[in-house]
Amino acid sequence: FEKCEIKWISQNSPMGFGHALLASKKFVGDKPFLLHTGDAYFPNYSFLNNFIKSSQYDKKITGTILFQHKKSLEGFGIAQTKKSVPLDIVFHVAEKPKKPKSNLAILPIYILKPDIFEALEKTSLGHNNELQVTDAISTLLDLNHKINAYNFGNNKWFDIGTTRQYFHALNYSFKIATK
């Protein structure tokens, strides 16, 4: 992507993805930004242009989440949406709920406006006693902000948060590279 500026932010201790995002506030400024976790691997980023464009069709959108239908939701934040065109409208999110109310897993790429920082500052610690982005998005929804959802469909991606998952992603990449 042309004119793309990437900033890396490290945490001294695990205080949550929301805390890491809050630490980036001074770099973001007043423009929308793409947020990508460090523990997810997408072998094909061809969806990204459409994902970015989808967040720009309505100036009232505060954020766009990426979701995928999943049978097993353990370890995922979930979204509940209302069907709309061109994107679904989010009306509820929850971070790793014990009893999910939908099968829409939130994937770890977001497009957000700086309003998220105010929401993070108003959000209490959540799952694992950490500040969570999903909880801040819930705060935005409570404040009547508009959040949309982009369906990732059946595209492949890997959670690489553990050694075993990272190995599977490397193995998959190796197979692609040696075809």
Which role does the model predict for each range below?
Residues 1-76, 121-122:
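Conserved beta-loop-beta/alpha segment of the NTase-like Rossmann-fold superfamily
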Residues 76-78, 147:
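Short, acidic/polar N-cap/turn motifs at the starts of alpha helices
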Residues 24, 39, 79, 113, ...:
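Residue-level signal for inorganic ion chemistry
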Residues 52, 56, 84-178:
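Catalytic-core segments of class I nucleotidyltransferases/pyrophosphorylases
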Residues 68-71, 80-84, 100:
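Short, conserved, surface-exposed binding loops centered on an aromatic residue
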